[in-house]
Every structure is written in C-alpha cells, then in structure tokens.
C-alpha cells in the first residue's frame, strides 16, 4: 500500500495547535502555580476541555478542597475563609492559620502490653494473711512486762488505746531501758518504730522524778532541768508527727516539755522556746546545725540520746555534712553528770551518749551513716529469726497489704486515674482516705487544679460554724473534688502537698487531711512517703513510679499500718516498665490489671463534671464513649478562654485591618483589639507539669533505668495524660534556659525604665511594667504573646514580603 500514491488531507482549522490559557485575578504566585498545573496536565495527556481557572489561596486549592479531619465538635471546617476570585475582593494572606483543632482517639495506635493477663491468678488462701506489723496478743505481751513504768503503760492502754506492743517494740524497749549501747532499728513501715525509741527515753527521764512504784522523789525534773534527748528527722512533716506522738505520751508527765525546730518556722520563736527550757528536742538537720552555731542557750552537755529517724532519707537528701557537724559538736561537749540544779543524772540516765539509728532499709548510705554516728551498735530487728544474709535487702511491705499494677497506655493514664478514683468512692465507707503519689510538684499542682470543683466557694457568714473551723492557710490546698464523686459520696475533699509550699500551709494541709471526716484524697510528692501516720488511709496510688525501690516501699507503707488492711495500686506503661515489678520485693504477689476493667467499672455511670460545666451524657453511653467524652472535656477546659478574657476577637479576625470598606488611616482601632491573647492558666499549668514530669522521669536510679527508658516515651501520647493535644516545647532548657530568660526579663525591665518607667504613654498590650511579673511566669506569657502579635503585625503590614520568593 505504500506504493499506491494515496494522499490523505486533514482539516484542522485556523485555531492554534496548542491552546493558550490565560489566568487572571489573584496573586502572581497563584497564577504561576495554575500555569504549572496546566502545563503538567497537558504533558500527561491532552484533554478536550481546557483546564479551569482555579485560584489557590493560602496554599490550598480553592476549587476543590481535599478531605479534612474531623474536629472536636464533629463538624468539618475549612482551614481558611476562601475569598471570591474577583480582583476587587480582598485576598487572604499566605500565612493563614488553621482554625481546626485535631484530637486523636484514645483507643488507637496504643502499644500492646507484654504482660500475660490471661494467666490464672494464684490461689488465694482460705484465711486472710496475718498482719505482719500488728500488735502482739494482749495475753502474751504488754508494755509493763517490757519494763515500762506502770504509769506509762496505764496511760498507753487507757488514753491511747495501745494495750500490746508490736514486734519491733518488744525487741527494742527492754534493750534501750536496760542497756546503754548504740542501736540500729530496722523494721518494715508502719511497725511502730517511733514508739520503740520514745518509750525508753520517756521512761528513763521520768525515773529522775518518780520511784519504781510511782511515788515521787524529793527532786523533781522540769523544763529547765536540761536537754536530755535530740531527735532528728529528714522532713518537717515527720518532725511534726513525732512531736504529736510524743506530746500524747507526755500527757502522763506534764512536767516534761518537748518542742520542734524545723525549717520554715521563725527562728526567733524557736530561740524563745529553747530559752524557756526544753527536755526533748525534735529537729531537722539543717535547722539544728544552725541553732548549734548561733543559739548560745542551747546546751547539749546533758544530752544522753541522739536519735536519727529515717537515716537513709537524710543521707539521700544531702544532710551528711550537717549530721557530721551535729554529731561532732555533741561529742565535743563534756558529758555533765549533774545538771545545773544539782540533780544527779548518772545511775538513772545512760552513762554515755546513746545514738539510735532507725531505717527500714540497709543500704550503703545507711551503713556510712552508721560509721559516722554509731559505736559498737546492736542490730535490732522485728523478727529475730531473719537471716543475716537478708540484711542488705529492702524490707517487704506488710503481708496484709494487697498490691496491684495497672498497665495502661500513656493516652489513657488520666481517664484511668479518674475512673479508678470514681470506682473507689462509689460505695459509702469503702475507702475513707486515698493518697496519690506523683513525681514532681508542678504535676501535683496541675492535677489538683484539674480535679477540683471549679465552683467558687461562698464566703461563710460570721455566725456560721464553718468560720471558726476555716484555716486561711488551706484556701489554695484544700477544695471539693469533681469527677470522682458518686451518689453515695457526693462530697470528696481534695488536698495537695509538696515541698514548694510554705511551712504553715504544709502543716495546715496535713492536719486538714488527717482530721477530715469526709472521704478525702491527698495528691502529693515523696515528701509524704516517710513516716507519716495518717489514720484511715485505705488506698495508695503510685501514679508515677518511685525513683528507687526503697521509696516504693515507703510509699505503700502509708497504708496497712499497725495491722490494718490496705491496698496499693501502681501505674505502669506498656513495654519496658512492665519488668519493674520483678525487682519489687513483696511478701504478696503484685497482681496485674487491665485498664479496660478499670474503665468499665469506673465509667459505668455518668461522670459528675464540675459545677460550672454541663454534661450531655446519658445512661445509654458505653464506657469507651464516656472515656473519650471525658478526655475531650478535659482538653476543652484547657483550651477555653480564661475568666475575664476578651472574647470579641471573632468579630474582627484581623485587628490591624479596619472594617470592610473603611480605608481611613486616621481611624484608631479600639484598644481592646490590641490585647494579646492570654492562655488559660490551667493550660500553662499542664505544659509546665508535662515538662517537669519528663525531667523527673530521667532521674530514676541507674540500676532501674532499664525499666524507665526515656527514649521509649511517646511524647505525643504522654501529652494526652496532661489533657494536652500536642507536647509543649522547652523541655530541655534547665538552668541555662532559666538564666537566659531571667537575663532577658532584667534587660526588658531596664529598657522600660529608660523609656519611661511604665508610665501612661505605652502602647496597650505591648508595654509591660515591672509589677506585671511576680516571679511565677505570668509576665513571661504576656511578653511572649506580645512578641507573637508584633511579628504577625509585621507580616500583615509589610508589603515587600509578598514579592520575596525566597
């Protein structure tokens, strides 16, 4: 067919072979992108219809938008308002912000636990476990048979309802009454170590004034007779508690006086009490060392006993140098055999200075403390049958304590905690008091603010009975709780306690928690883990695992004390943290629990939101939908505008652009439009709590970091545990970051003073006087908000940036 000479003619018309498409309107960048898109589509394949003129705004296609994620209110919003393609219409800036907030689901993308929850539980004993720290039988032992005077023994039985000693008291009291050697007391928490060393001291001091049959002697000892015993404890709370116990014992001997000298109190008042006279002094190491240096009336020549309670904790807190100084000064003073009034002390009191060291653990730092303070000491334990090979081991928890751990993903930690507390207080009288241990003070503050009721408390009338009971020191640390109440317990009191609070606030809060008749929850740090004996504590929750195993033992020792039953719950993350239970020395197995069972039990009924919030829940909702709704509610609380904030910004999205059609540059906008947006204080507290939690997570002891690997933390998931939708920045600043911030603040204050000292000529919303920042970070928030506002104004007003291709 190639040789037949056939020719074919095609009519293509007068139109050009390639269609020329012109794009009009919009910005030049948008037109350039449209041309490139048309060129690409022409190269991919010809089309019978020319490409449509699609104008993109803010980097998004205005003709057809892709699928958008669903937001918190269940509707799909556009990222930016799409203007008309007319040239006269105002164009949206290229830096248009997204207005939708994305909230991820709680039950997706969670790591799976490696613990086998299907393993059948261990067979429970037919009879409940016998309490290991309970008092002995009254028929077998009593305090009088241990050598305590009949007056003291009768006082303990009738006034304090203590008729029988515990095991550690049985082994310690006779030894300290009849002997003068140093002693190291080692026993589990809640076993009565405090009375074990207090009773011999009180008995032998009372013997200076009373005969064995209780008849008075010719010489009577009083508060000016001399200082006979010094008791040191690591924390102020423990000193206060020892003082309370000792005052109860000394009611049978009112001529003897005890007092406390602790940090945070007035040194002038402490000196006045010492000057009046004291027989037993209870102190923290730092304040005692200060008084030994500066208080001349403090005479330690008559001191016969030096007690170091919770010695391991004192070494961990860095009191080694203070203890060396105190022990050295006491030993350097000559031992007086006769006091200033001529009362002979030898023969009744020890002929040498006796040092008693108390600890529930036998660690290297305790052994070092023993080398500093003890000489030829005897080792006294609760059970003499224990082998010496276990001396280095951590003492186990009481046998009647039931322990469990909840393996919950990071996303679900917060709602699981609320569900656990809600189920705990579901029945009246089941649990009276619960303690939640958290790793850092910032996290304690955040969880307290989050869980408390937001309804403002009405001030009591002058005639009401609550006016007399009201303590101004607890206004910021005690409140009614929300979320965790139930019809059986409509009132649950919430308390917080940590070391950053002032001493009067700490003491008042602890007293309020101890004396509370309603169900109560204490959110605290490790400051409450040592020695505190709060009555009716039935539940201990370790929301954050302890930094070391000994701290874990002391934490759970706040419950199941003196033979009472108790429960302890440990929160762990899936993964490496699950192996942490293998190193916990426990007399009872730690039972793992599924977080689903906690949520099902706690969220079986409607959650009671704070009084200022309304709920749309119904009884037909499932526990999973309630968990998601609760998490969403908590996140919305953080994102809500703070009280008194300016909410008129929605009327004019751009405060620097006048009303539509108004081009008069002389028109001044309202001053409220220049106010920078201030974040919700609860949101700032959540961010700070998250940062502090991450830093605290990295401080576990070296031997346990294999179970707490910070590199395996999912920061985005962990942010949900603080009701945050994304992890905040500024985690790794440390001291350098704070120093740099402080330097910037100082420079800004100097600049403001030079420019006018914060007078009336400053711009609204941008100037910041020196009084705006009171040291709590609020001024930094305002300064950062003003900086962001200035940057946004420059981006809007600077026309040259539109043509900056780079």
Curated annotation (Swiss-Prot):
Domain Helicase C-terminal: 413-611
Record has Nucleotide-binding as a keyword: yes
EC number(s) on file: 3.6.4.13
Compositionally biased intervals (Gly residues): 755-768
Residue interval(s) of motif Q motif: 141-170
Record-level GO BP terms: endonucleolytic cleavage in ITS1 upstream of 5.8S rRNA from tricistronic rRNA transcript (SSU-rRNA, 5.8S rRNA, LSU-rRNA)
Biased composition (Basic and acidic residues): 69-78
Subcellular location: Nucleus, Nucleolus
Keywords per UniProt: ATP-binding, Helicase, Hydrolase, Nucleotide-binding, Nucleus, Ribosome biogenesis, RNA-binding, rRNA processing
Cited Gene3D superfamilies: P-loop containing nucleotide triphosphate hydrolases
Chain sites annotated for binding ATP: 187-194
The Helicase ATP-binding domain, residue ranges: 174-380
Annotated stretches, region: Disordered: 24-135, 642-677, 741-784
Domain of life assignment: Eukaryota
Motif (DEAD box): 309-312
CC per GO annotation: nucleolus
Record carries keyword Endoplasmic reticulum: no
A GO MF label: RNA helicase activity
Catalytic activity field: ATP + H2O = ADP + phosphate + H(+)
Cross-referenced SMART domains: DEXDc, DUF4217, HELICc
SUPFAM superfamilies: P-loop containing nucleoside triphosphate hydrolases
A Pfam family the protein falls into: Helicase_C
Description of its domains: The Q motif is unique to and characteristic of the DEAD box family of RNA helicases and controls ATP binding and hydrolysis.
Function: ATP-binding RNA helicase involved in the biogenesis of 60S ribosomal subunits and is required for the normal formation of 25S and 5.8S rRNAs.
Stated name of the protein: ATP-dependent RNA helicase DBP7
């Amino acid at each position: 067919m190639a040789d037949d000479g056939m020719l074919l003619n095609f009519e293509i018309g007068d139109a050009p072979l390639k269609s020329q498409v012109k794009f009009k309107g919009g910005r030049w960048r948008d037109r350039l992108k449209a041309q490139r898109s048309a060129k690409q589509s022409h190269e991919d394949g010809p089309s019978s219809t020319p490409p449509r003129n699609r104008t993109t705004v803010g980097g998004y296609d205005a003709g057809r938008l892709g699928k958008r994620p669903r937001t918190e209110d269940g509707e799909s919003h556009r990222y930016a308002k799409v203007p008309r393609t007319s040239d006269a219409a105002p164009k949206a800036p290229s830096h248009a912000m997204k207005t939708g907030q994305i909230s991820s689901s709680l039950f997706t993308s969670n790591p799976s636990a490696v613990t086998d929850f299907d393993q059948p539980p261990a067979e429970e004993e037919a009879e409940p476990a016998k309490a290991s720290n309970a008092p002995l039988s009254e028929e077998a032992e009593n305090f009088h048979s241990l050598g305590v005077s009949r007056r003291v023994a009768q006082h303990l039985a009738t006034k304090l309802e203590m008729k029988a000693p515990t095991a550690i008291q049985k082994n310690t009291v006779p030894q300290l009454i009849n002997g003068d050697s140093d002693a190291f007391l080692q026993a589990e928490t809640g076993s009565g170590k405090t009375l074990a060393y207090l009773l011999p001291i009180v008995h032998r001091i009372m013997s200076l004034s009373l005969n064995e049959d209780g008849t008075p002697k010719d010489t009577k000892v009083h508060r000016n007779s001399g200082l006979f015993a010094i008791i040191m404890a690591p924390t102020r709370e423990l000193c206060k508690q020892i003082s309370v116990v000792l005052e109860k014992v000394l009611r049978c001997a009112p001529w003897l006086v005890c007092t406390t000298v602790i940090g945070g109190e007035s040194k002038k008042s402490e000196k006045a009490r010492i000057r009046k006279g004291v027989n037993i002094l209870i102190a923290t190491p730092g304040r005692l060392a200060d008084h030994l240096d500066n208080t001349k009336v403090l005479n330690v020549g008559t001191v016969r006993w030096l007690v170091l309670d919770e010695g391991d904790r004192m070494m961990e807190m860095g009191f080694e140098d203070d203890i060396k100084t105190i022990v050295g000064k006491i030993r350097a003073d000559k031992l007086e055999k006769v006091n200033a009034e001529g009362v002979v002390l030898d023969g009744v009191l020890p002929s040498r200075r006796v040092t008693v060291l108390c600890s529930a653990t036998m660690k290297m730092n305790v052994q070092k403390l023993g080398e500093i303070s003890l000489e030829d000491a005897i080792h006294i334990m609760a059970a003499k049958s224990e082998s010496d090979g276990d001396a280095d081991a951590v003492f186990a928890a009481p046998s009647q304590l039931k322990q469990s751990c909840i393996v919950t993903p990071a996303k679900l930690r917060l709602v699981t905690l609320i569900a656990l507390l809600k189920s705990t207080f579901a029945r009246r009288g089941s649990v009276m008091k619960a303690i939640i241990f958290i790793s850092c003070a910032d996290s304690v503050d955040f969880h307290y603010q989050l869980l408390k009721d937001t309804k403002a408390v009405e001030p009591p009338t002058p005639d009401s009975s609550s006016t007399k009971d009201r303590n101004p020191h607890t206004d910021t640390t005690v409140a009614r709780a929300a979320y965790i109440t139930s019809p059986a317990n409509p009132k649950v009191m919430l308390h917080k306690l940590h070391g950053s609070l002032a001493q009067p606030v700490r003491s008042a809060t602890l007293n309020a928690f101890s004396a509370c008749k309603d169900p109560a929850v204490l959110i605290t740090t490790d400051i409450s883990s040592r020695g505190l004996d709060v009555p009716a504590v039935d539940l201990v929750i370790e929301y954050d695992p302890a930094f070391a195993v000994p701290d874990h033992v002391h934490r759970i020792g706040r419950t199941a004390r003196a033979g009472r039953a108790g429960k302890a719950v440990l929160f762990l993350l899936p993964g490496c943290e699950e192996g942490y239970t293998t190193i916990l020395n426990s007399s009872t197995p730690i039972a793992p629990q599924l977080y689903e069972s906690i949520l099902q039990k706690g969220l079986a009924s409607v959650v009671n939101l704070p009084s200022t919030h309304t709920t749309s829940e119904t009884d037909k909702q499932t526990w999973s939908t309630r968990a998601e709704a609760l998490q969403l509610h908590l996140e919305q609380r953080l994102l809500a505008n703070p009280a008194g904030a300016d909410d008129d910004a929605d009327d004019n999205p751009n405060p620097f652009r006048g009303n539509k059609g108004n081009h008069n540059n002389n028109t001044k906008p309202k001053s409220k439009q220049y106010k920078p947006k201030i974040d919700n204080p609860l949101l700032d507290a959540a961010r700070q709590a998250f940062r502090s939690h991450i830093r605290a997570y990295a401080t576990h002891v070296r031997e346990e970091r294999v179970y707490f690997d910070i590199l395996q933390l999912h920061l985005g998931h962990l942010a949900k545990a603080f009701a945050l939708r994304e992890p905040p920045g500024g985690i790794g600043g440390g001291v350098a970051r704070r120093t740099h911030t402080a330097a910037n603040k100082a420079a800004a204050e100097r600049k403001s003073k030079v420019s006018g000292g914060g007078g009336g000529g400053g711009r609204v919303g941008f100037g910041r006087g020196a009084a705006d920042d009171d040291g709590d970070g609020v001024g930094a928030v305002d300064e950062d908000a003003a900086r962001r506002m200035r940057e946004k104004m420059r981006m809007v007003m600077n026309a040259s940036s539109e043509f900056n291709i780079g």
